[in-house]
Amino acid sequence: MSNWTTYPQKNLTQAEQLAQLIKEADALVVGIGAGMSAADGFTYIGPRFETAFPDFIAKYQFLDMLQASLFDFEDWQEYWAFQSRFVALNYLDQPVGQSYLDLKEILETKDYHIITTNADNAFWVAGYDPHNIFHIQGEYGLWQCSQHCHQQTYKDDTVIRQMIAEQKNMKVPGQLIPHCPECEAPFEINKRNEEKGMVEDADFHAQKARYEAFLSEHKEGKVLYLEIGVGHTTPQFIKHPFWKRVSENPNALFVTLNHKHYRIPLSIRRQSLELTEHIAQLISATKTIYQKS
């Protein structure tokens, strides 16, 4: 790894090292998971969850919002009572995250592409170029046929607001349940299901094609695979592909921003760096150093 002049350097702070590696990189492939939004305060546990869903917690003893969002509700009226509030909280009304703004200022100076397992609004509200983002797990603001009868997504924020306003006893009025125009099955949120997968429409495939083209263009050279807030729930989307590409490019570097330690394959440990400081604080400090250098 001698081709990276700033790796490794133990005399640097984590922010100093990250800033220098970004500056030195020919290109960045950035994988972003739930930990980055959580670092900005958009957590799925605690008061944020408990304030929005006290009735659902009382009925089902949910431990967190992720568990609740994946629950098999008793009917579509209850499903949409929960999901409408969930969509408003995590998509329509979620404010901008400072770490996303800070990261954008850094990335705009580089050749980069982002893949994310997040389905919230974080990139849109922060003003990212959509052509540089691949939402591989779907988006909370979109709907799909619950039977996956055709590959098209839909959107109607007004109906979501109406569901929230008119729901009673954890049920939305039956007439507000959206239905597929092709097979008349109820709509559901466009989010990948472990068993069923998800609807992947033309826009999804366009996002995927742009991402894959970027990867093809940067198989060689100093490519920084930067993983931010990615756990081990769905490693097949970011973590494992990053490992593979780093192993195939002796000039690539794998850098993780995460307060947790995850096992890194022995084969790429000499090309890896773990940064464990608070994600939002580390990105902010990195931006300051990067812009001064």
UniProtKB/Swiss-Prot annotation:
Give the enzyme class: transferase
Q: InterPro entries in the record, alphabetically?
A: DHS-like_NAD/FAD-binding_dom (IPR029035), Sirtuin_cat_small_dom_sf (IPR026591), Ssirtuin_cat_dom (IPR026590)
Q: EC annotation?
A: 2.4.2.-
Name listed for the protein in its UniProt record: Protein ADP-ribosyltransferase
User: Deacetylase sirtuin-type domain: which residues?
Assistant: 8-292
- UniProt-listed SUPFAM superfamilies: DHS-like NAD/FAD-binding domain
Q: How is the cofactor bound?
A: Binds 1 zinc ion per subunit.
Key word Thylakoid present: no
- Provide the cofactor list for this protein: Zn(2+)
Question: Which reaction equations make up its catalytic activity?
Answer: L-aspartyl-[protein] + NAD(+) = 4-O-(ADP-D-ribosyl)-L-aspartyl-[protein] + nicotinamide
GO molecular function (one): NAD+ binding
> Which species is this record about?
Streptococcus pyogenes serotype M5 (strain Manfredo)
Additional detail = The SirTM-mediated ADP-ribosylation can be specifically reversed by the Macro domain-containing protein encoded by the same operon (SpyM50868).
Glycosyltransferase as UniProt keyword: yes
Q: Which residues bind Zn(2+)?
A: 145, 149, 180, 183
